[in-house]
Amino acid sequence: MTGKHVTVLMGGWSSERSVSLSSGTACADILEAQGYNVVRVDVDDRIVSVLEELRPTTVFNALHGPFGEDGCIQGILEYLKIPYTHSGVMASALAMDKGRAKIIAASAGVSVAPSCVMSRFSLGAEHPMKPPYVIKPIREGSSFGVVIVGSDETMPLHDIMNNEWVYDDEIMVEKYVPGRELTCAVLGDEVLDVCEIVPKECFQFYDYDSKYKSGGSLHICPAKLSSNIYQNVQRMSLAAHQAIGCRGVSRSDFRFNEETGELIWLEINTQPGMTSTSLVPDIAKASGRTYGDIVKWIVEDASCMR
């Protein structure tokens, strides 16, 4: 037994609740197998009093989406002086905001696609930029709310202006870059291997189903790329991680257009999924680490005020 009391936070109330429960359960299981004293907490509005009562040695943050990875729970844990995993308050808030994260990444020499941030209510019949482009909620993950507008399509107001839209009113409109889906993880200050994601033909892009359904996508790790492109993905992943101020593990996503040679950084994820079909465990395997190795490393890296 390690003697370390780890509370795993999962669930919550964001649109990524089910993914968080899967990540949290998997991580809690492996930590228990490694001898940690684990308590699983499905987060609700009583979380402050729950944490005050438990007073864990460490919190493993397996929450996804708003509240869990935008600086909110991180601020609570800082106030309670409980060491926690993954990025801190500022980096979490910045990374969750796709527009601001792109500005910071670009300032560090990371290649990004042209984009603009606006209210969804300002959209009209005319395209906000020349199609093809992508519309994304500014603060969502797991591809929730993503709309791709093709070259010959009209403005999809019915998808964005209807009453079923449950995401932020602020959106990002970004040039669509065709090509291969690439991702790369950073662990501390070490950049890991590059992985290519190949969604099954039934999926238009790497959406929620292709991410989380068993067999929804193929992970090729290490990716079959030229050494120049491979190293550029690694360089930009580390540059974004450091410029935004991330700690622990992060994962950056890219698009690579082989026809034009265009390599574009899309976003950084400070709370990457840790389910059985998640990317970080697969990337870890390529670097000689087991799933248990990486979960243990994340826990031992936990801290406050960093």
Swiss-Prot record:
| Entry-linked NCBIfam families | D_ala_D_alaTIGR, PRK01372.1
Q: How is the cofactor bound?
A: Binds 2 magnesium or manganese ions per subunit.
Protein name (Swiss-Prot/TrEMBL): D-alanine--D-alanine ligase
Q: Pfam families from the xrefs?
A: Dala_Dala_lig_C, Dala_Dala_lig_N
One MF term in the entry's GO annotations: D-alanine-D-alanine ligase activity
What catalytic activity is recorded?
2 D-alanine + ATP = D-alanyl-D-alanine + ADP + phosphate + H(+)
Look up the record and name the cofactor or cofactors this protein needs.
Mg(2+); Mn(2+)
Is Oxidoreductase one of the keywords UniProt gives this record?
A: no
Q: Which organism is it from?
A: Bartonella bacilliformis (strain ATCC 35685 / KC583 / Herrer 020/F12,63)
User: Which pathway features in its UniProt record?
Assistant: Cell wall biogenesis; peptidoglycan biosynthesis
Outline what the protein does: Cell wall formation.
Domain named ATP-grasp: which ranges?
Answer: 102-300
Gene3D superfamilies to which the protein is assigned, alphabetical: 3.40.50.20, ATP-grasp fold, A domain (3.30.1490.20), ATP-grasp fold, B domain (3.30.470.20)
| Class in the EC hierarchy, top level | ligase
SUPFAM superfamilies cross-referenced by the UniProt entry? Glutathione synthetase ATP-binding domain-like, PreATP-grasp domain
Q: Binding residues for Mg(2+) 1, per the UniProt record?
A: 253, 267
Transmembrane regions listed in the UniProt entry: none
**GO cellular component, as recorded:** cytoplasm
Subcellular localization is given as:
Cytoplasm
